[in-house]
Amino acid sequence: MTVMVSRIEYIGQIVRGEATVIWILVALVLVAYLILPNPTYRTNVKVPTVRYLGGWMPDLVDRLFFNTKATSVIYDGYKQYKKKAYKVLKADGDLVVLSTRYAEELRQLPASTLNALEATFTDHVGDYTTILTDSHLHTETIQKRLTPAIGRLIPRIISELDHAYEVEFPKCDGKWVAINPYEVFLRLVARVGARIFIGDTLCRDEQWLKASIDYTKNIFVTIALLRPVPGFLQPLVGRVLPSSRSLNHQLAYIKNEFLGPLIEKRREMESSGDPNYEKPDDFLQWMMDLAKTEQESHPHNLAQRLLGITSMAVVHTSAMSLTHILYDLLVMPQWLQPLRDEIQEVNPDWHSTTQAHLIGLKGMDSFLKESQRFNPPGELSFHRVVKHDLTLSDGLFLPKGTHICMAAGPISRDADVMSDPDTFDAFRFVKENRPTSGFVSTGATNMHFGLGRYACPGRFFAAFVMKAILSRFLADYDFRFGPDQKDRPKNMMIGDKIVPNVSTPIFIRKRTTSKPL
């Protein structure tokens, strides 16, 4: 199997090979920053500013350093001001990081006061990643249709994974074969996502899979490359960035060649009056049924919304989490056999997996949560944009336009919140056994999926898919690093975001020491 070249590795090659261009861009940034009256968004919230270099350098330097030193800045701010609020300086604007003591007060506020979609749009440089934020249709569809349907969708998930394992994994009976775990998991999750989100017609079409996966990768690359760019330069850089330009072409291709015709065909069938026609039972159809306005119902908007939710909220994040988990097991192999024992006890017949079986994997659930605690998707969570001037209960004034968030990473590593926080204890949440101990649970001390009514709605579906994938992989395969890889591959930091190393190969071999599932 050919291992695909990582887009993140490609980013590194660009940076190393274009040093002269980068220095020219840095010079242009400095000149523009000095001559423009308002080069980036600044908030006038009266809270301390936490800097990487202290207060003796211009703001611009701290903003540029944020992309590589965000973790240090955020943890330092939390250490000093965890009961208060503080400000950090990003290349494209200021973030006000609030204490968890505001959590209950803020989580109940409506979107007209604190807007999560606008914050997500900003955080994911939405002007250049084709993200739609003009309605909550996708969130409503997940909450009203997808999550309640998970129980009856599990057989479809297992069926698609069974096919995916056959076509995506190399033959490795009695021999070690190299794979790129991120790439393999990405394709597994993409196949499952396609089965549930667009149904049987397209889900195994290789052109669809390639187009949707490339779209996912280009979103991630665009975000990674644009985050360190000052906001006033993003319109220039974003329009010439190859990954951003590719996104627009890919989006048009997917709309015109796949989803647009599929939507139109379904509408024709529905309006034909054929008594034998049954609506497809998939996410696309649910969105079509729940759309209330002409704009929401437009085929291109439906297609774009579906691509956004599958690409970033399901496929990419799940593949990253699974890669983290594999690396954790490789450097902490003492947890592997207990997980295998649990799988054999709770879910011995993988092909007959039910929702109850996956819920019963308590040890695996705890492992997922502990892996996320050490390798969260980001150090910051609960992103919101303040839509009108807001004064909090203690008098803190947040002007309209302020981008707020909370320090999810430091909170989950705080000794006041978590006992022995620097020790990886795979089953700590089984022993803890609290209402917030589940992988998908959220709370003021557990915000990696967000908090409140706009916490990640797709986390329930993603968790079941990850458990289904892991149940078979851990039971059927042995795995190890290559001979030159001794330690866990270092995570890559992109601002406050954390991603696994996606270019490290591992070696797998079909297990013969126990009965495969």
From Swiss-Prot:
Residue ranges annotated as transmembrane are 17-37
Which keywords fit this entry according to its UniProt record? Glycoprotein, Iron, Membrane, Metal-binding, Monooxygenase, Oxidoreductase, Transmembrane, Transmembrane helix
Q: Name one GO molecular function term.
A: iron ion binding
The record's subcellular locations are:
Membrane
Please state what class of enzyme this protein is.
Answer: oxidoreductase
Q: Which InterPro entries match?
A: Cyt_P450, Cyt_P450_E_grp-IV, Cyt_P450_sf
Under which name does UniProt file this protein?
A: Cytochrome P450 monooxygenase penP
Taxonomic source organism: Penicillium crustosum (Blue mold fungus)
